[in-house]
Amino acid sequence: MRTQIYLTIAFCTAVLAASPASAQVTYGKKPQLPAPFATESAGNGPSETKPPAGFLPSVPAGFHINIFAQDFKQPRFLAVAPNGDIFLADTGGGKVVVLRDPQHTGGAQQREDFAEGLNRPFGIAFHDDYVYVGNTGEVLRFRYDKRTSKRLGDAEHILDLPTGGGHFTRTLAFSKDGKKLYISVGSSSNIDFEKDQRRAAVLVCDPDGKNSRIFSSGLRNAVGLAVEPLTGEVWVSVNERDELGDNLPPDYFTSLKDGGFYGWPYSYIGGNVDPRVKPQKPELVAKAIIPDVLLGAHVAPLQFAFYTGKQFPESYRGGAFVAEHGSWNRASRAGYQVAFVAFKDGKASADPVPFLTGLVPDPGGKNVNGRPVGVAVAPDGALLVSDDGAGMVYRVSYAP
């Protein structure tokens, strides 16, 4: 079986619009991967990420895209409140912003700060009368008015999180029954051993921060974190390790098992040993779980959202939209798009296919036209996509 290095990019736009689930299924199969160092490790980050004036990304036939909101410092995680308001983590600005479209124009007419002075906020979740925010070193919660989205009082600190090194994002998601809070914490490095076992892991705790423990481990940097609505399973999108070559290893999108181990730093995609890591732990590698869906090497998947709306065609219902921030460690760029993964009965049923594209004018060039980060399904079924390269939020609607 071929390695998933985005061969699906060959699918034409018409096929994507009509049948996004038509790609070859890899779910549950053991992938064949290239050898480590089959190519040199390339340092190839983009020089410029701002799009030219008037630019809009491409979407499949029948869909429409427009700018929903703009002029943010670093727009990242998106979340939809129970009342339909859109919450956005403007990470570079150290704040959480509320966006509204009361006249249903397709653009945010109202914009106000919910909380400021935060430390690189990212994850946002709602539970009872609280808005939860993942700062890089802690979980905070704010009591708020669920009708108006107005904050009621100061932040309450409920849990310390490890800090330092790389991978500062802290993503939050509540269990289907609301009794547990899941928190993703990335590693501090590429492949070094961690002193704090809570890194490169997904944690779980009570809504008040008590009884925290490791839920799943061996996850180098699980930036995306959400609960699948039908099954209640926890899913993550994972940024795998760098500097093994252009096509190794694939980043991935997978469900998690309580107590499951996913390889890092000893191995990747199951039992594929990283020769740089010494000493090895073969007993752990033997337990490493193969992820559900491979996304492609170095595409940098960040937030994802399960499509729970009714506006898009039936073939998109229940599937997942995955924002790919884009590569720096490939000679030719990969990612820089939003991909779609079809689901059936709460399980991934097909390879990912491109959905929002057009951000890379020249795969061998230095400039790109944006870097997707966040995705969320708006109350009307449109898809919202934050782009921290462009400093804006796009809205994708279906209008055949």
Question: Residue ranges of each PLM-predicted region?
Answer:
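Blade-level signature of beta-propeller repeat domains, shared across WD40, Kelch, NHL, RCC1
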Residues: 376-400
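Asp-box/WD-like beta-propeller blade repeats and closely related beta-sheet repeat scaffolds
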Residues: 111, 120, 125-127, 137-176, ...
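Surface loop/turn motifs at the tips and blade-to-blade linkers of beta-strand repeat domains
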Residues: 67-72, 112-117, 158-164, 214-218, ...
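Conserved beta-propeller blade signature
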Residues: 85-89, 130-133, 180-184, 233-237, ...
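A short loop-to-beta-strand structural motif that recurs across blades of beta-propeller domains
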Residues: 95-98, 138-140, 201-203, 252, ...
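Hydrophobic core register within WD40 beta-propeller blades
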Residues: 78, 124, 172, 222-225, ...
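Beta-propeller domain segments
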Residues: 24-60, 169, 187-190, 197-200, ...
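Structural WD40 beta-propeller signal
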Residues: 71, 81, 127, 175-177, ...
